[in-house]
Amino acid sequence: MLQDFPEKLRQRIQSLPDEPGVYQYFDSGGSILYVGKAKNLKKRVSSYFTKEHDTSRLRLLIKKIDEIKTIVVKSEADALLLENNLIKELQPRYKIGRAHV
């Protein structure tokens, strides 16, 4: 399924580190869509693009992703704190508070 996405996104996903951190998805207009945390950024972000999704809301999110930004942190706990702060600050369309897509 990863091959169905633009080369820019495939390259970005393949270059992600195997470290804890926070990832942010943006649409083509630069608006924030989603903020999430991961203990392994590469595995977590890749999972969105390599499996079938059971909700139409999640499928819609994935179709809108144009850019992926990440912030590497030292621990999963740091990722959780940063994720919560970024959600409050950026108010992404697909994740408010701890509620998932």
Give the location of each predicted region:
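Acidic, glycine-enriched active-site microenvironments
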Residues: 1-98
